């Protein structure tokens, strides 16, 4: 991802090209995956086609994690509803529902071959994961609401935490994740180079 951003000259220009995913301008004609997404005002983001389900999390790689937080909530609210048309696309061996479970908790394994889970934003005010080793992962976001969908501040085990990822070890050792949610994006959090999740490529000199 880092090299892809570099090929686009800068992080800004890389993500200047990404927002059109959320409109219907790309193809110029109707295809079935896009028809249902357009109806939901999601444009070309075909969530029912599993290979795209990591895409929103990529904002975390380019210093704009608040955009991931916004769009992830939009997908959960619009595409997972208890109505006849409330579940987009197909399941593909549990991937679409697994995406929701991870995303509702506030993180997702974008690159399963790494040891990292990329941060989104939780859907609940509190959730607890009881691990097989007897330890717990607790995610607390008491101000969470339909309006308060952005991460203002986050702590991991009592310490301020700005990274846009958790390591597998962080979670498996038991973790307490405390998140202060806000109705405004914090554009100063998670923007340092060391806050970006794993990338196979690194900056080239």
Regions found by a protein language model. Give the residues of each.
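Beta-rich accessory regions
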Residues: 66, 81, 111-114, 118-205
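Active-site core of glycosidic bond-cleaving carbohydrate-active enzymes
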Residues: 1, 8-138, 143, 169
């Amino acid at each position: 991802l880092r090299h892809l951003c570099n090929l686009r000259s800068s992080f800004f220009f890389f993500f200047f090209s990404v927002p059109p995913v959320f409109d219907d301008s790309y193809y110029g004609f109707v295809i079935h995956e896009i028809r249902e997404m357009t109806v939901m005002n999601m444009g070309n983001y075909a969530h029912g086609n599993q290979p795209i389900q990591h895409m929103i999390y990529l904002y975390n790689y380019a210093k704009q994690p608040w955009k991931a937080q916004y769009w992830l909530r939009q997908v959960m609210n619009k595409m997972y509803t208890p109505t006849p048309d409330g579940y987009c696309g197909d399941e593909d061996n549990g991937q679409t529902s697994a995406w929701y479970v991870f995303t509702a908790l506030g993180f997702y394994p974008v690159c399963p071959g790494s040891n990292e889970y990329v941060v989104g934003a939780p859907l609940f005010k509190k959730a607890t994961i009881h691990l097989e080793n007897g330890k717990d992962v607790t995610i607390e976001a008491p101000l969470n609401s339909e309006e308060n969908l952005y991460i203002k501040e986050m702590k991991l085990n009592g310490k301020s935490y700005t990274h846009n990822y958790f390591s597998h070890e962080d979670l498996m050792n038991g973790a307490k994740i405390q998140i202060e949610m806000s109705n405004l994006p914090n554009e100063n959090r998670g923007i340092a180079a060391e806050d970006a999740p794993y990338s196979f490529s690194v900056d080239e000199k």
